Amino acid sequence: MKLGLSALLFPKASVEEVIKFSAKLGAECVEIIYDVPHFQPDYDQRKLSGIKELLDAHGLGVSVHGSFWDLNPASHHRELQKLTLTQVRRSIDACRTLGGEIVVLHFGRCPVPYAKDFLEEAKRRYRRFIEKCLPYARERGVTLALENAIGQPTTYPSTVEELKQLVLELEGAKVAFDIGHAHLAERRAGMNDTGLAIANDIKDLRGHLVHAHVHDNRGKNDDHLPPGDGDINFKPVVDALRAINYRGLLIAELWNPEHPLETGRKGMKKLRDLFKTS
């Protein structure tokens, strides 16, 4: 397992600075978010070769989080869905150029989930969207990893069960497991100590889970705290990842734009403490 940081932590920095900061903080890899503020929609991808050289110079592995701000793969607006597809394909191209293997894709959103027919159509739109992305990624040697949501009815897939069913049905689709999101989903489902439930989710995704986001929260908001600053019981989670012989990247996906270096340093230390091998 390689331990790393997400560019989410550094919204005020350039992508080049994100890479340098991550290396300085002891990361072994970095997750680039192919979206604003680091990449404008019309970003000239010829510049990616310089970013690749910088990653190589620091010996960092890389993954890419596909574009998602202001976008929605399940949108009922055709033009928005078309734009989302364009930007996700550009994310896949960026991943290939940077030498990465994983592109993380966000869930779809349905604004009126209580209208059942509308929700079902949003689910179909999301599925068709992924079906369009998969061959594009496959041709470029990139794996699409679908991220679990926080258990809200406005998202699809909203539960780990829905996510697993989706990747079983879509050949080539894999899972990016977000531990903080799983904690929120289990809390919404009525669980108090969510550690064992999250561990069971991980074991249930054996063979599908290829990427992981690690962050903490207090069960109410998606705070993106360093592990230990919230109330997630990480021990069974770590044990479960070891039990399935997880070998992918572990990305600390943290948020503190006012003090990113301090938070990143703390997050990397917590990752090493949790996942260090004897």
Question: At which residue positions do the language-model features occur?
Answer:
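N-terminal pre-domain/capping segments
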Residues: 1-100, 174, 196-197, 268-278
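Histidine-acidic metal/acid-base catalytic patches
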Residues: 1-2, 12, 16-23, 101, ...
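Active-site-proximal loop/turn and secondary-structure-junction residues that shape catalytic pockets
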Residues: 9-11, 34-36, 68-70, 107-111, ...
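Active-site acidic/histidine proton-transfer and metal-coordination neighborhood
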Residues: 16-17, 56-57, 74-174
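Generic enzyme active-site microenvironment
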Residues: 29, 33, 63, 145-147, ...
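A short acidic, helix-capping loop that chelates divalent metal ions and anchors anionic groups
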Residues: 36-39, 70-75, 111-116, 183-187, ...
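Short, flexible/disordered intra-domain loops and linkers
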Residues: 40-42, 115, 119, 154, ...
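Catalytic-core regions built around general acid/base machinery
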Residues: 46-59, 129-136, 200-204, 236-240
